[in-house]
């Protein structure tokens, strides 16, 4: 079986999901072509030409609409050189419906992996008609999707054992508390209300919305306009004594889009896989799978929880080990194995 994997446009966060699926499929012996849609979109969006006969007057070669068209044409080019059985589109927000419709019309089975449920389910719902199979990262709107499409499934977030595993950590990254994630406004407001005084804290991720005078600014471990890749993030997890999972509150306003998800997010699974202790922003699935980990509901609850657990090493290490055992089977390989089985049944 041959898969063409179309990476998402953004080069952070959901890119880790794409690489996880790619590697999981390859572990099964599947022939996977990794289509770097992100690089191509960046290239066409960034290309400039000199219109001044060497005088240095540079203009953009393409506006964004044209850049998207050219990047989408490159998907077609790769597809018809490789001719896959399955096209796995991760996220797909920058892939045009025409591109998917063309591949379906020529007999390729198009799988759309939706990574933004339920926050952007309005957009994902409108897009799913162009796929043969739709995979959701949260089941809260599963029945709504199934009312519109005959082959929709919830596939849980997963981790890559080569990246997310227990370990001693790195001395330079040792901390009392670490959090890696996008600095959405809701998260900024939450963390600014947490008492971190006296704790060694590391924050990572894209925090471009953070004000210069925020008390969180000195805690960012890199430039605020940078991201932290998954390998570095896992090392931060292994090096810290505690962490926290906090879901964003931002969501689109269309049909089905909201922030009240059911499923565990990717960071919860990755933290548990690294055997890192963390406190939870509760959700039904994590309440079921990770009930051994404590929960919080407001910023004022965070510091007392951290103080108690940081003072009790044995108890903290015990629940972290139990959390790892609870997610040990949630690998990309297992998700990939399910998908191959689903596509080849009958």
Task: State what each model feature region is.
Residues 1-57, 64-70, 74, 81-83, ...:
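Nucleotide-sugar donor-binding catalytic core of glycosyltransferases
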Residues 72, 76, 299, 303, ...:
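Short, amphipathic alpha-helical "lid/cap" segments that border enzyme active or binding sites
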Residues 76-80, 100-102, 120:
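Catalytic alpha-helical scaffold of carbohydrate-active enzymes acting on polysaccharides/glycoconjugates
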Residues 88:
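N-terminal Rossmann-like NAD(P) cofactor-binding module of classical short-chain dehydrogenase/reductase
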Residues 102-117:
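Active-site proximal beta-strand in glycosyltransferases
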Residues 117-132:
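Membrane-proximal helix-turn-helix segments that form the acceptor-binding/catalytic region
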Residues 311-342:
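A charged, aromatic-enriched C-terminal amphipathic alpha-helix characteristic of glycosyltransferases
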